[in-house]
């Protein structure tokens, strides 16, 4: 099931980031951070009252953050753009205002935009850290967005009330027959890299279309095909009409749409335009895939449009590897969606990555492996002179593969030794195209790297 997307909107300095961090900080995954992603987290999964959802810092998504020193007119324009983007892309909206500042013209302007949507809007009055401030929240009834809920994101006061109201609008977690397990591939990338052309080429190559399920104006379009007798769902993020007028540039490319596709897939095909080379946006999207712990294949498209000599392929491959060194496990495939060159290989690569994600190493074999690699390279501790021992290992889950190593003190394990173990695991067992997660647990408590 696709998690609902909840967008946080509001003026600068009203406490959006504090509220966002409080929500995300309440729930830690097995491994919170992975190497290779240095950007700020603009989104994350959380849950409340049995409802799981993805919360998004809309200002960060649209503008890479916010600058309160901008001219007032520019701040107003950006804040309004947040609201328009949220209306177009999110399933629900949390509109945060500042109880200390009181009602401002910019708040009213955003409210005018939000009242045009039928999507649920929760009005949260932040910085109400006293009884007097909470009473002042009634001023925001004037926005005609329902009952204003006082809260203090910094202290955590009232945040539960905001989430209680929000989850009234979110559907309970259910599963349908269409969600039976099979390979799901998301086609992602910047605008105009050939996502739709690739999808059309994949659909046109000796495969029968089982079903074509159109999404809403917010959802990617799913097309299920059969390939070698197995169903494969292709999730396309291109060519989807958007409701409402969005800021230029955002019209063509939606982070939320890409997030939704990545969250639902097993393997992402990240398209790179060979005529333009690797861009920062390409690596940013790869970072999304890493953070979601999904399989990844780097697809260099428009290879037919490049003038080549005997060194071109290797030089471009080196360029891609250098730019994406934080996903050095991802295969690189050079294709042309226009001519069909090597496109037929992509589904085979994706099927293999899917198999690698499901691979499980028996515990006895894993511990033989651990003894062997420790003989080659004893465990390294972060503290000089500290005594570190690794006792045994298990693989508690797949998709992605997670390896749990028990130590006398998990805090002592140096990050480079985690990398060493990952490299040795990949050398021995493959895991091509999928992240693997290394977790260290002390005998007394769990510690993660």
From Swiss-Prot:
Keywords: GTP-binding, Nucleotide-binding, Repeat, Ribosome biogenesis. Residues 359-444 form the KH-like domain. GTP 2 binds at residues 189-196, 236-240, 301-304. InterPro entries: AAA+_ATPase, G_ENGA, GTP-bd, GTPase_Der, KH_dom-like, KH_dom-like_a/b, P-loop_NTPase, Small_GTP-bd. It holds the Pfam family KH_dom-like. GTP 1 binds at residues 10-17, 57-61, 126-129. GO terms for biological process: ribosome biogenesis. Residues 4-174, 183-358 form the EngA-type G domain. SUPFAM superfamilies: P-loop containing nucleoside triphosphate hydrolases. GO terms for molecular function: ATP hydrolysis activity; GTP binding; ribosome binding. It comes from the Bacteria. GTPase that plays an essential role in the late steps of ribosome biogenesis. Belongs to the TRAFAC class TrmE-Era-EngA-EngB-Septin-like GTPase superfamily. EngA (Der) GTPase family. Associates with the 50S ribosomal subunit. This is GTPase Der. It comes from Chloroflexus aurantiacus (strain ATCC 29366 / DSM 635 / J-10-fl).
